[in-house]
Amino acid sequence: MEGAHLVEAASGRGLVREVFVTEVAAPRHAALLDRQDATVNLVTERAAKALSDTVTPAGLVAVCEPPAADLDDVLADKPALIAAGVHISEPGNAGTLIRIADATGAAAVIFGGHCVDPYNGKCLRASAGSIFSIPVVIEPDAAKAVTVLRAAGLQVLATTVDGEMSLDDADLARPTAWLFGPESQGLPANVADLADHRVHIPMRGGAESLNVAAAAAICLYQSARSLR
């Protein structure tokens, strides 16, 4: 991962294993580097550029251990709110979903089906460090995840443009797991059909749909508000 904000977030969880920094960047991040238990290596600008996946390298890169996250452990704590992204391939949307879930107090984020790697560089940056603050569970079988969530006592709500229930009418005071699919294809039918309800977000303007991040922000905020 790259940049002071992400390295700071990961080091707070004890996940940093090795740090690479240029001579130019080292003085700017002296306090952060001094707090590291991991090995800190000085590297050339050329090496830093090779390690970077951004147009303008930050000069600070860390190798980290992904935090362990297991769905059974998440459910053992009787969560009130979970966000699940299904077939989310765009890293910016995936990272923003993590950030929104963290901001609204969700207990975890689940990525089901063929999703982008949540530790992709763009996804990490979009999460703004929240990926180290909230459990992120990867479950290739999205239908299985829905079944497990319902068995644990959560109502599962699938966001769809043609849902039979309006968000305004949903009972969000109950423990809830939200399902979000990509804007272009939506949720797979075999996954949406397993949910307790298919929910649509009322829209008054000319927009026909919302992307994952926008839909998640609305639905998770509404749930968090009802659960207060």
Provide a role label for each language-model segment:
Residues 1-55:
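N-terminal positively charged helical leader segments and presequences
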Residues 3, 89-97, 210-215:
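Amphipathic alpha-helical repeat scaffolds
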Residues 4, 24-25, 47, 67-68, ...:
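Short glycine-rich anion-binding loops that position phosphate/pyrophosphate groups of nucleotides
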Residues 21-25, 65, 87:
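Structural motif
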Residues 62, 100-104, 118-131, 189-228:
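Structured adenosyl-cofactor binding patch, chiefly the S-adenosyl-L-methionine
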Residues 69, 75-163:
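RNA substrate-binding interface of SAM-dependent RNA methyltransferases
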Residues 157-207, 211:
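Active-site/ligand-binding-proximal alpha/beta "capping" segment
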